[in-house]
Structure formats: structure tokens, C-alpha cells
């Protein structure tokens, strides 16, 4: 091997005789520079392996504002802590825009409330949550551990603007479709009021998933609706996935299992 290397370099690296082998000037230079070069090569291989495993790069996530209380922060935190080579950024987006943004590459992944339509993407169930209502602690129905849908329908019901999330709006309004008398729905003037001041009248109810408890202002509470179906949260990825996308999927799947987001 040494003679082949000398032939390729066109110079002797060793002086050989019957008693000893001594490095030439070229051989000494090679011996001095080889360890750093090999270490750099090892680092290059490690970097390539990390990239192939989806552990390097910039990750852009768009999420529905309503999953910003718990689900999106938990996934982003796990991605950051478990992958030091990833630069992760997450921003709220209008829910109907998330799947198209993933499909055309403006963002790498999305987290949506409800299974949103869209071409060129794959949707993975990330979380199931009970549907209930937010209400003032002094509301007459707050004394019940669970609320009947028919009982809730007797009060004014606040729903988000349908344009913000048609899938969820239609799912929530459908809960009360068969209620008599017909429920009184209204859309708030302020689309996202963190104080939830309209619920403090002790009359109005706001259908919401149980994750709403995580960002609930003082004076309000949440109660499940008996017999209501689950509200779902989905991870949205491109149909054609890179190692980075497969990494996101694996981390999300592990997190959902650990936090019991998907009951057996």
C-alpha cells in the first residue's frame, strides 16, 4: 500500500534499508497532516449521516392558532431538544392555508385542527381530544361534570368564523343539528380574544376541545359534552418525503404515544 501511495504521489515517503525505515521530508509532511485530515473526513461522514437521518437542516412549521396552547409547542420543543442540528421555527397560519403551503414547499410541515383537505400532502393523526364547552364558572351548567348536548343548545353558542376553519366550524355546529329549539350561534367580533370576555356573562358557551384548558383565563372552566365525537389534530407532511420529513413523523409519533394523545 505504501509503495502504491508513493507511486500515486510521485515521490518517496520512506527511506528503507536493511536496518531501518526513515520518513522522507514528504513522508514527514504527510504524517503531520494526515490526522487532522482524517478527523475532518470523519466529521464530514458524521455530518452526511446526520443529514441522511433528517437530523440537520432548517425546519419550518405552520400551525393552527388553536393548537398553539399545547400541541405545537410540545412537538417543537421535542424536535429542538432531540435534534441539536435542526434549526426549528414555527409560526401560526390560517388553517386553510397550511396544507397548500406544505404541498408547495413554503413550509416543511403543518399542524392543523381537523383533517383539512388538500392535494400533494399526507395527513397523520397526531391527537384526539374530547369536545366540550368553555363557560363561566358561575354558569348554571358549570355544576355538572358532563353536559348534555341538548342542555348546551339551550344557551347562546359562540363559534369561530367559518372562514378560519370550515372543517371544525362544521363539525362543532353539526353537534347541535338535531337540537330543538334550534341553537343560537354567533361569531365574536374579535376573532381571537385571549380574555374570552364574552363568556363571562354567565350565559354564553363556546364549544372547544379539552386542550382549551391549558390557556384558560381565570374565572372560566371547561366541561365535556356527553356523547360528542373527538376533535382531531393532524400532522401534515408532503406526499414525497425527505429524511427530514420522516424524522418529524418519527418524533411526532413517539411524542403522541408518550403523552397519550391517541388513546388505545
Show which residues each predicted segment covers.
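Central regulatory/effector-binding core of bacterial HTH transcription factors
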Residues: 56-118, 189
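Alpha-helical linker/hinge and terminal dimerization helices associated
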Residues: 8-9, 30-52
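Secondary-structure junction motif
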Residues: 113, 155-179, 244-247, 259-263
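Flexible hinge/capping segments at coil-to-helix
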Residues: 123-131, 135-157, 245-246
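A short LG(V/I)-centered, amphipathic sequence patch enriched
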Residues: 4-25
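A ligand-binding cleft/hinge motif common to bilobed small-molecule-binding domains
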Residues: 113-119, 170, 178, 191-221
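C-terminal effector-binding regulatory domain of bacterial HTH transcription factors
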Residues: 194-195, 209-221, 226-264
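Ligand-binding "clamshell"
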Residues: 117-130, 144-145, 214-225
Amino acid at each position: 500500500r505504501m509503495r502504491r501511495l508513493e507511486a500515486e504521489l510521485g515521490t518517496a515517503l520512506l527511506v528503507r534499508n536493511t536496518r531501518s525505515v526513515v520518513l522522507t521530508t514528504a513522508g514527514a509532511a504527510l504524517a503531520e497532516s494526515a490526522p487532522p485530515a482524517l478527523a475532518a473526513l470523519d466529521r464530514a461522514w458524521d455530518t452526511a449521516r446526520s443529514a441522511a437521518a433528517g437530523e440537520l437542516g432548517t425546519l419550518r412549521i405552520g400551525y393552527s392558532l388553536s393548537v398553539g396552547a399545547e400541541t405545537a409547542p410540545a412537538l417543537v420543543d421535542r424536535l429542538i431538544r432531540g435534534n441539536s442540528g435542526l434549526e426549528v421555527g414555527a409560526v401560526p397560519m390560517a388553517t386553510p392555508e397550511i396544507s397548500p403551503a406544505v404541498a408547495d414547499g413554503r413550509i416543511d410541515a403543518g399542524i392543523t385542527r381537523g383533517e383539512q383537505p388538500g392535494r400533494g400532502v399526507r395527513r397523520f393523526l397526531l391527537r384526539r381530544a374530547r369536545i366540550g364547552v368553555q363557560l363561566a364558572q358561575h354558569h348554571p351548567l358549570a355544576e355538572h361534570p358532563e353536559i348534555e348536548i341538548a342542555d348546551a343548545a339551550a344557551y347562546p353558542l359562540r363559534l369561530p368564523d367559518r372562514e378560519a376553519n370550515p372543517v371544525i366550524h362544521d363539525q362543532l355546529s353539526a353537534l347541535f343539528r338535531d337540537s330543538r329549539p334550534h341553537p343560537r350561534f354567533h361569531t365574536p367580533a374579535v376573532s381571537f380574544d385571549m380574555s374570552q370576555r364574552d363568556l363571562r356573562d354567565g350565559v354564553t358557551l363556546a364549544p372547544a376541545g379539552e386542550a382549551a384548558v391549558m390557556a384558560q383565563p381565570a374565572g372560566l372552566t371547561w366541561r365535556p359534552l356527553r356523547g360528542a365525537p373527538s376533535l382531531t389534530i393532524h400532522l401534515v407532511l408532503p406526499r414525497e418525503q425527505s429524511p427530514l420529513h420522516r424524522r418529524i413523523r418519527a418524533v411526532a409519533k413517539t411524542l403522541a404515544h408518550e403523552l397519550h394523545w391517541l388513546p388505545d
